[in-house]
């Protein structure tokens, strides 16, 4: 028996495209978003079931984002066509992320800063500290890794951060680091490092605008929380 079901064969209230139109793209699950890309299932399952299994096999979005052609083809029901669709989607995502790192990206609020680095930092298995260098109009000049490892005020030296800022004629900076646990609650050391960098910035005339902590798809702004 051929059980292949297209999205259009599903009840209307279960169709991802109709849900997108009615409620917005944000309302769709990861499975439904992937289903819109792949469009059809196979002889034994519909596209929703197939996409659920793909994400489960890959270990979620993180695994899918890092999957290669061979790994995708090893998933039952994924042939050359569907593997190519997924790889094209992943490549577009990577290129878009790279595009956003350019100097045409303007930061007007903490959300802008968080979204600039979110997709890269949310999956990291250890802590990274990045500095976003800004010009006088808050356009991004550069995003630079300055430290890898747990933040500690005795290890993280402001010199490394402001050296990059001075080299790139930065007017102000935003620092961002990730919590691999996904919990964005700032630690005592996070706060100490922020204050130390802020004070050093005052001395040399380069303002620290914010410290953004990245979790798994969420963030916290120390500025918004009145911690900085």
Swiss-Prot record:
Species: Clostridium tetani (strain Massachusetts / E88)
Positions of Zn(2+) binding: 177, 179, 190
GO molecular function: metal ion binding; metallopeptidase activity
Assigned keywords, A-Z: Hydrolase, Metal-binding, Metalloprotease, Protease, Zinc
Ranges for domain MPN: 106-228
UniProt cross-references to InterPro entries, sorted A to Z: MPN, RadC_JAB, RuvA_2-like, UPF0758, UPF0758_CS, UPF0758_N
GO biological process terms held by the UniProt record: proteolysis
Descriptive protein name: UPF0758 protein CTC_02075
Intervals of motif JAMM motif: 177-190
Family that this chain belongs to: Belongs to the UPF0758 family.
Signal peptide range: none
């Amino acid at each position: 028996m051929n059980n292949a079901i297209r999205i259009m064969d599903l009840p209307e209230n279960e169709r991802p495209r109709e849900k997108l139109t009615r409620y917005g793209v944000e309302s769709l699950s990861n499975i439904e978003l992937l289903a819109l890309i792949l469009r059809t299932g196979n002889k034994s399952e519909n596209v929703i079931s197939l996409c659920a299994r793909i994400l489960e096999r890959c270990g979620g979005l993180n695994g899918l984002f890092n999957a290669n052609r061979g790994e995708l083809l090893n998933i039952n029901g994924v042939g050359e066509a569907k593997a190519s669709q997924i790889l094209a989607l992943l490549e577009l995502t990577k290129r878009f992320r790279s595009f956003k790192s350019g100097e045409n990206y303007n930061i007007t609020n903490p959300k802008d800063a968080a979204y600039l680095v979110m997709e890269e930092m949310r999956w990291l298995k250890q802590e990274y500290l990045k500095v976003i260098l800004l010009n006088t109009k808050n356009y991004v000049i550069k995003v630079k890794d300055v430290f890898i490892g747990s933040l500690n005020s005795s290890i993280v030296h402001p010199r490394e951060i402001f050296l990059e800022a001075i080299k790139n004629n930065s007017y102000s900076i935003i620092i961002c680091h990730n919590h691999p646990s996904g919990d964005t609650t700032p630690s005592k050391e996070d706060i100490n490092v922020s204050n130390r960098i802020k004070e050093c910035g005052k001395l040399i005339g380069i303002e620290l605008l914010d410290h953004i902590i990245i979790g798994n798809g969420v963030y916290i702004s120390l500025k918004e929380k009145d911690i900085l």
